[in-house]
Amino acid sequence: IYNCRKDIFLKGDMHTLLMFPTDQILIARILADRQGCYLHSCGVNFAGKGLLFVGHSEGGKSTLATLLKGKAEILCDDRIIIRSTAEGFKIYGTWSHGDVADVSGNSAPLKAILFLEKSEENHLIPLENKKDITKRLLSYLIKPFVTVDWWDKTLSLIEKISAQVPCYVLRFD
């Protein structure tokens, strides 16, 4: 690992070992070969149920993690791994956090995906259109240097997630 600023390296609190998001780019590639992908999302284990709150920066992921602290295990508030297993889909915490430094390497069975939208009122809206769900998931996907092979595996996985995992829009204030 190379860094020309020793003071920054020794201070710690880096979101990546290389001070550039190369680790997530490398992991995103490897996950495709292991029936997995990496999403811009907050994941929690709520009473043994994995909930995935999906959103871009400033979308409310860290806010929800803060609200759920003490009520659910925070896996990570910014980057979550999803993998297909023999038991179904699981979410895994990562070290690549946002504003909430609570992270866990634990996993939980994925029970629902909630796409975050800021609103003046709180609503939970079920999503039924699988193509819409697929498009939404693709827009939050952490991508490596893409190849045809990676896209084939990842698209297949995203379509499978869209078909099997309940998805919602969570509007909240």
PLM features: what roles do these ranges have?
Residues 28-43:
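Conserved NTPase motor "head" modules and their coupling/switch loops across ABC/AAA+ ATPases, GTPases
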Residues 23-24, 37, 155:
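Short, well-ordered alpha-helical scaffold segments within catalytic/effector domains
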Residues 59-61:
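Conserved glycine(s) of the Walker
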Residues 1-28:
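Charged, amphipathic alpha-helical linker segments immediately N-terminal to NTP-binding catalytic cores
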Residues 12-14, 36, 126-130:
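Short hydrophobic/aromatic-rich motifs at helix boundaries and adjacent loops
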Residues 40-56, 66-173:
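Glycine-rich, often acidic-flanked micro-motifs
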